[in-house]
C-alpha cells in the first residue's frame, strides 16, 4: 500500500480522503443515536440530515443536524410508523442528495428490505448487507449460522414456530423452563419466559403480538431457558475485504425483563480462557457470515462457565459507548468509513494493536417510575441539569428543560457512561454522576440505578440476567427529594392565587427577618448562644429519672415557671399558627435565657394537628428540631387522656404507641388531663406515660368559680378529685384553669388546701388571663405553696393567653425567687414582639380583658377560635348572642367541665342554637326531633366519658333516641385495638419514608395525615421557608424580595420571582418564572381565579318544607344521594364543610329526592338550595360532625 494509506485516523478524518464524494449522511432514527452519529459525521466533515415525525418536531435530534425533514404529511403515519416508513425515508434521502443512510439502532436498523432498497437507490447503507441481515438478524437463521461455524448454542427450535402446538411439542421434548423470543429485533420485546404448561399458550400469543408491534414481524422461536446466566456480548468490526476484529466484550447481565439496565465493560469475573473462547467464537461467526461493518455477537454463560451463542445484532448497540471508552476506538467513525470502502488496516484497526484500558459502565437514564413497575412517565421536563467531569461521558437525546416527554417513544433521556482505571473507580464515578443530575417534572429511574450500584452483589460484579427480578430489596428506593422545585411550586401558587392558609386575613406587618436578640449574663456581657447551653433541669431528669425529678422540684426553695409561649400562647392569640421556622430562630437564645425553667410547653394539644392541617409541617420534625436546639430544658406536652392528642377516644394501644414515640422523640413532662375530669379516662393517659417513662403531671381541670354558692365544682369536689388522682399515681399534681376563672382568693384557698393535703407532692398551676387577673391569681398560688406556675413572654401574654412572665417575676421580686433573670425574659420578649407583627394576619383582634368570662366560662384557647369560627360561618355579627348561647348550652349539658373537646361540644351546640334560632326551651322540647351536632351526640352517647353528676335527663335520652347507644363504661373499652403493623404496611404502600411517628400521626388524625402527605408531595418541606415568604406572595423582580431558604446545613437557595405569564385559556394555568441560585426555572400554576364561572345558586324557600337549604356558608364535600332516590329518616343527603365543622345534612322523614342543586366541591352560602324533595314535610336540621383543630 501507499504511504498515505497508513495515515493516522485523525488525519484521515480531517481530509476525508477515504470518504471521497460521500459527504452527506442521513440518520434514519430519532433521539440520542442520531445526535451521536451527527457528532462523528461533523468530525468527518460531512453534512448531516435528520428526519422526524410530526410528534418529534421539537426533539433535539432535529436541531443537531444541518438539515431536517418531516416524514410524510401530518396524520399520515403514527408516531412510530413514521420511522418505519422506509419508502418515505428513501424518498427524502434521494430528493436531498444523501450519499449514506445510517439506521442507528431499533426501528429499521435490522430490516433487510430497507438496506436493500437503500442500496438499490444508489445510497450507501452504513451497516451489514441485506443478505447478512437476513442471515444473522433472524435469530433462527443465526442459530443455523452457529451450527455452520461450530459454535455452541442453547437447545432450541430449528426454525420459527407457527403455533402453540409447535411450542408445546418442543417443551415436551426438552422440558421447562423455556423462553419464547422474537426472531427479529431485541431490547426485551417479544420475549416471554415460561416455567409451566399452563402459561405456554398465553406466552406464545403475547410474545408474537409484541414482536409484531415492535418490529413489524411476529415471527418467534423457542429455546431452553438458562437459569441465572451471565449475558456477554462481543463488539465486532468487519470491513468489505473479509477482515474481522473484536473490540473485546461487554457484560450486560444486569437486565430487567430482558432489557439491559447497566452495562459493564469489560466482564470483570469472566475467566480468561472463557473470555478468549467467546471472543474467538464471535470472530468465527462474523467470518462465516461474511459480515461487514459493526455488529455484536451475544452469548450466555452458565454457572459452569459454559458459553452459548444466542444472536448477532447487525447494528450498532446502545452500549457501544463504553467499548469506545476503554479501547479508544470511535465505532461510528469506523462504521461510516468502512461503508465508504475503507479497510480495517487503513483505519489502523488491527487486532494486535487493540487493547483495553480500565473499565467502563453505562446506565440509561429514563423517564420510568421504578416504584410503579417502571411505568414510563410523561410530561414536561421543568428542570434539567446534567452531570460531567473526569471520566463521565453523556450521550443525550431529549434531555433538556422544556422537553415534552410523550408516551410514543422510548423513555430514555441520556446515556451516562463512566470510566476508570478499575472496576470500583468507575462505579463510584457513576454514583457521583447520577447524584449530580437534577431532572424535575418527570419521574426517572435514577433512584433505582443508585440502589443497584450500591448493592453488594453488583459491587462484586456477580450479577446474572434475572438479578433485578430476583432481588426485591433493590426496590426499597430513596426517591429524590426535589426540594427546590417543590418550593418553587408553592411560591408560584402563592404568586398566582395568594395565601391558602386558613384563617389568614391580610399580610404580615413585619417586612423583614426578625432580629434575634442577644442574651446577656449577670455582668451584662453578651453570651455566645452558638455553643452548647448550660445544664438545666432536663439533665437532672435524664440522670435521676421522673421520681427524683419530682422530689427535686418540690424541694426547690423558690418557685419554678413553665413557659407556654411555644404552644398555648400562639394557640390562644394567633390561632396556633406559629411555625417551626420561627421557634427554631429563638430556640438557642431561649436555651440560655430560660435554662432554669421547669419546662417549655411546646407540643401536643391543638399544635399537633394544626401543624399538619394548616401549616403543612410535620409535628414530629418540629419536636426533633426543637429538642436538638434546646437540649437542657424539659419539654412539656398537653395530652388529652384517653384521646391522646385527638378529639375523640382511641383504643388504648394507640395511646401507648403514640406516647412511646413522643417520649423517644423528646417530650419529658406530660400534662395529662381529661375534659370531664373523668378519672377512668385520665388513667389511660397516665398509665401510658408511665409505660413510656415520662414525667406524669396528672391534671384536674378547674371550671367556673368555686367561691360561688351552690356551684357543684366546689373546694370539696377538687380535694376529692385530687385524692383520686394521687391514689392513681402521679409525679406532679396540676391544676388547669383553661378559662381563667380561678380568682386570686379561690386560688389561695384551693392551693393552700391541696398543699395541706399533699405536703410532699409538687403542684403546678396553669391559667389564662382572660379576665385580667392572671398575674394576681398566680402570685396567690405561689404564696399558697405552688411549686410551678405557667407564664409566657410579655408580648405573647394577657387576655386569652397566660399571664406575663416579667410582670409575674416582678410581682414576686424580693419575696420568692424563680431563677429566671427578668432581664433575660425581656431580651427574648423583643423577638416575640416582632412575631406578633409577623403573625398579625391571624390576630383575633381582642382589645383587652374580658371579665365576662366569669359568666360564659369560655376557655381562653377556645374564645379566639370560636370568634374566628363564628366569623367564617356567617355568625360574626351575632357574637354577643353566641356567648349568651354558650352559657345556655352549658346549662343544658349539665354545667360540664369545659376544655377540649367538651368545650367544643358547648360551642357547637351554641352555634347550632344561634344558627337555627333555638332557645333552651326549644332544645329541650324538640330534642327528639332535632339533628344535633355530632359532637353533642358523641357527648350524650358517652364517647367523651361521664360528666360529674351524670348526664342531664330526660335530655340525654331524647337527644340520642334512635340515633346512638348509651355507653356505661369507658369509651376505649368498646374500641378494637389498632393493628399497628398492618397500619404501617398500608402507609408504606401509599407513602414514602414512613416511620413510627407517621403511624402515630395517622392513628390520631387519618384524614389530616393523608392530606398532609399529599401536600408534601406537591410542595415538599415548607417549614424551611421564612414565614413572610410562606404567607406573602413574592413580588416580581425586586432585589429586596429575594427569598433566601436554608434547606439544610450549608445548603441555601436564593429565589427571585422574575415574571408571571398570561392566563392560558385552554388550561386555566399561568407560568411563573423564578431565578433559583442564578438559574432560570419555571413552574406551571393553576389560576384558581382565572376562569371562574359566576354561579348564582337558587335559595331554599324557608316556608317550603320540600326545599332544603345550607345552614351556613361552606363547601360541598360529598353528595350522598341521587335524583329520584328514596331516603329514609336519618339518611345523609350531603356533607358540607365550613372551617372547623363538617355538616352532614340528613333527612328527618322518609321521602324522595327531586332536584339536586349542587355537586362536590361547590361553594355554597347560607340558605343555598341543596336538594329539593317531593315528599319531605318536616323542617330539616343538621348533624354537625366536628373536625377540630
Curated annotation (Swiss-Prot):
Binding site for substrate: 567-571, 640, 900
Residues where N6-carboxylysine is found: 736
Location relative to the cell: Cytoplasm
Entry binding sites for a divalent metal cation: 568, 736, 766, 768
Reaction catalysed by this enzyme: hydrogencarbonate + pyruvate + ATP = oxaloacetate + ADP + phosphate + H(+)
GO MF term list: ATP binding; metal ion binding; pyruvate carboxylase activity
Active-site residues per Swiss-Prot or TrEMBL entry: 315
Cofactor: biotin; Zn(2+)
Chain ranges of the Pyruvate carboxyltransferase domain: 559-826
Coarse class of the protein's main subcellular location: cytoplasm
Functional pathway: Carbohydrate biosynthesis; gluconeogenesis
Function (record text): Pyruvate carboxylase catalyzes a 2-step reaction, involving the ATP-dependent carboxylation of the covalently attached biotin in the first step and the transfer of the carboxyl group to pyruvate in the second.
NCBIfam families registered for this protein in UniProt: PRK09282.1, PRK12999.1, pyruv_carbox
Protein name as it appears in the record: Pyruvate carboxylase
Gene encoding the protein: PYC1
Amino acid at each position: 500500500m501507499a504511504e498515505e494509506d497508513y495515515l493516522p485516523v485523525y488525519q484521515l478524518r480531517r481530509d476525508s480522503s477515504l470518504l471521497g464524494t460521500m459527504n452527506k449522511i442521513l440518520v434514519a432514527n430519532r433521539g440520542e443515536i442520531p445526535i451521536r452519529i451527527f457528532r462523528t459525521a461533523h468530525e468527518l466533515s460531512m453534512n448531516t440530515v435528520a428526519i422526524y415525525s410530526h410528534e418529534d418536531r421539537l426533539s433535539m435530534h432535529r436541531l443537531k443536524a444541518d438539515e431536517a425533514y418531516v416524514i410524510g404529511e401530518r396524520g399520515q403515519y403514527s408516531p412510530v410508523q413514521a420511522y418505519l416508513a422506509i419508502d418515505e425515508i428513501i424518498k427524502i434521502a434521494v430528493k436531498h442528495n444523501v450519499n449514506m443512510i445510517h439506521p442507528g439502532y431499533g426501528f429499521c436498523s435490522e430490516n433487510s428490505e430497507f438496506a436493500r432498497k437503500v442500496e438499490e437507490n444508489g445510497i450507501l447503507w452504513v451497516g451489514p448487507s441485506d443478505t447478512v441481515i437476513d442471515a444473522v438478524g433472524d435469530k433462527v437463521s443465526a442459530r443455523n449460522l452457529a451450527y455452520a461455524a461450530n459454535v455452541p448454542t442453547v437447545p432450541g427450535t430449528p426454525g420459527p414456530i407457527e403455533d402453540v402446538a409447535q411450542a408445546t411439542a418442543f417443551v415436551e421434548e426438552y422440558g421447562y423452563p423455556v423462553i419464547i423470543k422474537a426472531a427479529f429485533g431485541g431490547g426485551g420485546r417479544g420475549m416471554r419466559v415460561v416455567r409451566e404448561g399452563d402459561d405456554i399458550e398465553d406466552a406464545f400469543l403475547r410474545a408474537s403480538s409484541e414482536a409484531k408491534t415492535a418490529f413489524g414481524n411476529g415471527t418467534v422461536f423457542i429455546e431452553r431457558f438458562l437459569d441465572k446466566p451471565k449475558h456477554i456480548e462481543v463488539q465486532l468490526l468487519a470491513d468489505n475485504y473479509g477482515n474481522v476484529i473484536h473490540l473485546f466484550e461487554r457484560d450486560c447481565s444486569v437486565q430487567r425483563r430482558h432489557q439491559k439496565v447497566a452495562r459493564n465493560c469489560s466482564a470483570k469475573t469472566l475467566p480468561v480462557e472463557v473470555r478468549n473462547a467467546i471472543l474467538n467464537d464471535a470472530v468465527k461467526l462474523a467470518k462465516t457470515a461474511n459480515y461487514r461493518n459493526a455488529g455484536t455477537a451475544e452469548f450466555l454463560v452458565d454457572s459452569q462457565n459454559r458459553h452459548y451463542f444466542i444472536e448477532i445484532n447487525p447494528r450498532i448497540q446502545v452500549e457501544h459507548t463504553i467499548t469506545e471508552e476503554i479501547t479508544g476506538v470511535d465505532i461510528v467513525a469506523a462504521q461510516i468509513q468502512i461503508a465508504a470502502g475503507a479497510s480495517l488496516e487503513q483505519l489502523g484497526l488491527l487486532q494486535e494493536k487493540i487493547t483495553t484500558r480500565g473499565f467502563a459502565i453505562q446506565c440509561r437514564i429514563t423517564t420510568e417510575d421504578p416504584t410503579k413497575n417502571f411505568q414510563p412517565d410523561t410530561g414536561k421536563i421543568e428542570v434539567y441539569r446534567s452531570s460531567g467531569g473526569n471520566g463521565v461521558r453523556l450521550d443525550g437525546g431529549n434531555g433538556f428543560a422544556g422537553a415534552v416527554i410523550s408516551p410514543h417513544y422510548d423513555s430514555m433521556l441520556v446515556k451516562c457512561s463512566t470510566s476508570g482505571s478499575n472496576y470500583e473507580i468507575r462505579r463510584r464515578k457513576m454514583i457521583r454522576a447520577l447524584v449530580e443530575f437534577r431532572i424535575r417534572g418527570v419521574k426517572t429511574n435514577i433512584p433505582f440505578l443508585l440502589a443497584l450500584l450500591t448493592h453488594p452483589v453488583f459491587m462484586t460484579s456477580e450479577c446474572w440476567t434475572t438479578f433485578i427480578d430476583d432481588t426485591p430489596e433493590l426496590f426499597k428506593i430513596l426517591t429524590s427529594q426535589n426540594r427546590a422545585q417543590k418550593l418553587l411550586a408553592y411560591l408560584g401558587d402563592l404568586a398566582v392565587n395568594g395565601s391558602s392558609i386558613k384563617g389568614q386575613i391580610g399580610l404580615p406587618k413585619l417586612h423583614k427577618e426578625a432580629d434575634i436578640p442577644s442574651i446577656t449574663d449577670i455582668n451584662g456581657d453578651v453570651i455566645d448562644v452558638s455553643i452548647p447551653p448550660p445544664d438545666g433541669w432536663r439533665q437532672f431528669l435524664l440522670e435521676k429519672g421522673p421520681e427524683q425529678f419530682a422530689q427535686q422540684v418540690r424541694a426547690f426553695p423558690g418557685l419554678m415557671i413553665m413557659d407556654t409561649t411555644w404552644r398555648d400562647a400562639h394557640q390562644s392569640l394567633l390561632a396556633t399558627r406559629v411555625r417551626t421556622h420561627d421557634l427554631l430562630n429563638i430556640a438557642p437564645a431561649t436555651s440560655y435565657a430560660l435554662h432554669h425553667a421547669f419546662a417549655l410547653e411546646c407540643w401536643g394539644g391543638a399544635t399537633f394537628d394544626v401543624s399538619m392541617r394548616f401549616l403543612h409541617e410535620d409535628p414530629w420534625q418540629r419536636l426533633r428540631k426543637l429538642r436538638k436546639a434546646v437540649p437542657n430544658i424539659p419539654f412539656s406536652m398537653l395530652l388529652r387522656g384517653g384521646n391522646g392528642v385527638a378529639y375523640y377516644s382511641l383504643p388504648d394501644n394507640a395511646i401507648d404507641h403514640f406516647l412511646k414515640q413522643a417520649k423517644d422523640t423528646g417530650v419529658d413532662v406530660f400534662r395529662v388531663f381529661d375534659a370531664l375530669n373523668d378519672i377512668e379516662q385520665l388513667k389511660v393517659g397516665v398509665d401510658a406515660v408511665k409505660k413510656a417513662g415520662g414525667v406524669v403531671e396528672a391534671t384536674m381541670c378547674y371550671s367556673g368559680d368555686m367561691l360561688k354558692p351552690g356551684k357543684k365544682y366546689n373546694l370539696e369536689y377538687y380535694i376529692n378529685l385530687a385524692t383520686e388522682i394521687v391514689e392513681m399515681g402521679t409525679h406532679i399534681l396540676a391544676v388547669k384553669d383553661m378559662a381563667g376563672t380561678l380568682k386570686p382568693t379561690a386560688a389561695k384557698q384551693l392551693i393552700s388546701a391541696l398543699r395541706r393535703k399533699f405536703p410532699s407532692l409538687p403542684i403546678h398551676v396553669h391559667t389564662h388571663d382572660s379576665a385580667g387577673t392572671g398575674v394576681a391569681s398566680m402570685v396567690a398560688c405561689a404564696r399558697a405553696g405552688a411549686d410551678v406556675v405557667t407564664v409566657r413572654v410579655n408580648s405573647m401574654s394577657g387576655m386569652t393567653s397566660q399571664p406575663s412572665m416579667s410582670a409575674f417575676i416582678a410581682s414576686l421580686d424580693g419575696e420568692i425567687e424563680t431563677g429566671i433573670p427578668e432581664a433575660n425574659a425581656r431580651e427574648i420578649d423583643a423577638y416575640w414582639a416582632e412575631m406578633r407583627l409577623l403573625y398579625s394576619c391571624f390576630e383575633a383582634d381582642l382589645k383587652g380583658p374580658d371579665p365576662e368570662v366569669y359568666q360564659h366560662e369560655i376557655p381562653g384557647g377556645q374564645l379566639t377560635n370560636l370568634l374566628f369560627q363564628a366569623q367564617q360561618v356567617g355568625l360574626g355579627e351575632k357574637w354577643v348572642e353566641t356567648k349568651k348561647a354558650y352559657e345556655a348550652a352549658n346549662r343544658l349539658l349539665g354545667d360540664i367541665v369545659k376544655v377540649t373537646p367538651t368545650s367544643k361540644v358547648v360551642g357547637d351546640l351554641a352555634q347550632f342554637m344561634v344558627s337555627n334560632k333555638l332557645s333552651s326551651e326549644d332544645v329541650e322540647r324538640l330534642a327528639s326531633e332535632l339533628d344535633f351536632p355530632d359532637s353533642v351526640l358523641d357527648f350524650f352517647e358517652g364517647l367523651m366519658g361521664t360528666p360529674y353528676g351524670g348526664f342531664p335527663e330526660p335530655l340525654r335520652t331524647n337527644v340520642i333516641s334512635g340515633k346512638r347507644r348509651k355507653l356505661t363504661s369507658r369509651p376505649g373499652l368498646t374500641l378494637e385495638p389498632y393493628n399497628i403493623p398492618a397500619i404501617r404496611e398500608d402507609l408504606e404502600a401509599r407513602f414514602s419514608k414512613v416511620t413510627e411517628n407517621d403511624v402515630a400521626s395517622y392513628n390520631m388524625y387519618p384524614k389530616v395525615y393523608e392530606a398532609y402527605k399529599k401536600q408534601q408531595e406537591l410542595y415538599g418541606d415548607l417549614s424551611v421557608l421564612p414565614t413572610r415568604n410562606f404567607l406573602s406572595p413574592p413580588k416580581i423582580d425586586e432585589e429586596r424580595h429575594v427569598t433566601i431558604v436554608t434547606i439544610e446545613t450549608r445548603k441555601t437557595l436564593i429565589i427571585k420571582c422574575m415574571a408571571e405569564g398570561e392566563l392560558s385559556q385552554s388550561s386555566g394555568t399561568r407560568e411563573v418564572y423564578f431565578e433559583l441560585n442564578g438559574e432560570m426555572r419555571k413552574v406551571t400554576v393553576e389560576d384558581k381565579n382565572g376562569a371562574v364561572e359566576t354561579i348564582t345558586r337558587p335559595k331554599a324557600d324557608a316556608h317550603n318544607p320540600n326545599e332544603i337549604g345550607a345552614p351556613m356558608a361552606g363547601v360541598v364535600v360529598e353528595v350522598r344521594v341521587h335524583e329520584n332516590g328514596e331516603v329514609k329518616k336519618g339518611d345523609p343527603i350531603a356533607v358540607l364543610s365550613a372551617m372547623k365543622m363538617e355538616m352532614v345534612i340528613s333527612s328527618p322523614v322518609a321521602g324522595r329526592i327531586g332536584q339536586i342543586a349542587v355537586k362536590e366541591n361547590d361553594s355554597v352560602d347560607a340558605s343555598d338550595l341543596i336538594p329539593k324533595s317531593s315528599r319531605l314535610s318536616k323542617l330539616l336540621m343538621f348533624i354537625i360532625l366536628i373536625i377540630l383543630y
